[in-house]
A protein has these predicted regions:
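N-terminal ordered "arm"
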Residues: 23-75
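Solvent-exposed loop and beta-edge segments used for protein-protein assembly and interaction
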Residues: 38-40, 86-90, 145
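Interaction-surface and assembly-scaffold signal
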Residues: 2-27, 127-282
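Hydrophobic alpha-helical segments and helix pairs
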Residues: 95-133
Length: 282
């Protein structure tokens, strides 16, 4: 007798052992068991102005640049995550502001071109369930010394990124940048992604290809602390031999012109949603 799939529960491969536990489903199939997650986060970011024509080459169908071509590179270090039973992991992302126009939906926000993570579990759930463009790399904890913060990323011994933050100064809570107001004209707002899943056996064809949205929160949690200052980013150009499956990603960022840096930040916060409100943009 074969096993049935319960349409009320979430499954991922391998399905043979029952519903998969993860960020949006706890043990026993309990949905949204961790939506009040109180993880502790440290987020480091550096932004720079680049060449708009170079960013346009990275845009999927329906996407256009919005405003200045400012790229933000960020690393976030997370601990005490509920759905991992108190464990943590780190992420590295690259985004820039876009507008997406579908047949029905219009959305604005940062386009998350890629998100590296140093743990398999969030990579699989994020790619399959949410449509994030997630891949793996090593993301060690930042090194803080002599007034500087250094962050790196590597893959099997090849270091492909260096981030340096300097002259960081504490920002008083009354001076925190205001949260972006949500559009009132029906335009959606949040982080925008492009989900693509290839079709098995029909190489070059897709099982899924569409834009998805992580909706912006109406009441985002303010950070516990914020520092602002200066920063630099350097992606180290790679050969195929260095990064056989990622060299083209690294080199695309390495080739971006840096016209000027637009500041850096270090932010500490507590909490994080389970992204159960993730939706397809149609």
């Amino acid at each position: 007798m074969t096993y049935p799939l319960n349409p009320e529960l979430m499954y991922m491969m391998p399905t043979h052992f029952g519903p998969m536990s993860g960020p949006r489903q706890g043990p026993g199939g309990k949905k949204f068991a961790f939506e009040q997650d109180q993880r502790k986060c440290m987020a480091v970011s550096v932004s720079f102005l680049t060449n708009a024509a170079q960013l346009q080459e990275l845009l999927p169908p329906g996407f256009e640049l919005m405003g200045e071509p400012v790229v933000t590179v960020f690393e976030t270090y997370m601990k005490e995550i509920d759905w991992l039973a108190g464990r943590g992991y780190n992420v590295l992302g690259v985004n820039f502001p876009v507008v997406y126009q579908g047949q029905k939906d219009r959305a604005v926000g940062p386009f998350l071109t890629v998100l590296w993570e140093n743990l398999t579990d969030p990579i699989l759930t994020g790619r399959e369930q949410l449509g994030f463009s997630k891949i793996y790399c090593d993301l060690p904890e930042p090194v803080v010394y002599n007034g500087e913060t250094h962050c790196t990323a590597s893959w099997m011994g090849f270091r492909f990124l260096d981030i340096k933050l300097t002259h960081m100064k504490e920002v008083a809570a009354v001076d925190y940048p205001p949260s972006s107001s949500l559009p009132t004209d029906g335009t959606l707002s949040g982080t925008i992604h492009y989900k693509y899943m290839p079709r098995t056996g029909e190489w070059g064809k897709k099982d899924a290809a569409y834009a998805v949205l992580s909706p912006a929160s109406e009441k985002p949690n303010p950070p516990q602390s914020l520092m602002q200052g200066e920063g630099t980013v350097e992606f180290h150009r790679a050969r195929w031999e260095d990064l056989p499956t990622q060299y083209m990603v690294i080199n695309a960022f390495s080739d971006l012109e840096i016209k000027e840096y637009r500041g850096a930040s270090i932010q500490h916060s507590v909490g994080g949603g389970d992204l159960s409100n993730q939706r397809i943009l149609s």
